[in-house]
Amino acid sequence: MKRKIALLLITGICLANTVPCFASPSMKVSVSSSEENQYSTLPDGDTLQKDVGFRPKAPASLAGGYLFGSGNITESFDLDSNGAPVNKQKGISFKYIKKDNNTSKSVSLSAEPASGQSLSSNASVIKYGETDLYYSTAEANSLAWIDGDVRYILMDINK
């Protein structure tokens, strides 16, 4: 367990730079898109710009021997007081896989525009240089940060 936490922290630190943040009072909903919007190979910056409207960092591998496995476009939005979707935006979710003998482990790295996003208030905050890293175990072991205008979440989906 401590190794997983350390791996999440190290990988997050490698990808993080600066962290401004902004709070949103409405409920956030995220939805993964259909299979037609999936990537079997790592997309380049131009493809991501065209597909989701921004250029998130998209490393081929992560610390600890995790390699790109797949990716898909996500859509997130807030719900207004009537339950109608507002503030729709696209994001990206990449799955990284590590294979050891007969065991396969995976982590997820997601990115979406940071505008109007808040980071978990239940998380432990770890300062790394100028970057605040938010570690949480609420849904899974996750590490979140904002770099420029992109919000990243690294999640251990094996929990």
Where are these regions (language model features)?
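Surface-exposed amphipathic alpha-helical segments
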Residues: G148-K159
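Intrinsically disordered, low-complexity segments enriched in polar/charged small residues
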Residues: L8-L9, T103, I157
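Short, solvent-exposed recognition patches
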Residues: M27-S142, I146-D147
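Sec-dependent N-terminal signal peptides of Gram-positive bacterial secreted proteins and lipoproteins
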Residues: M1-S26
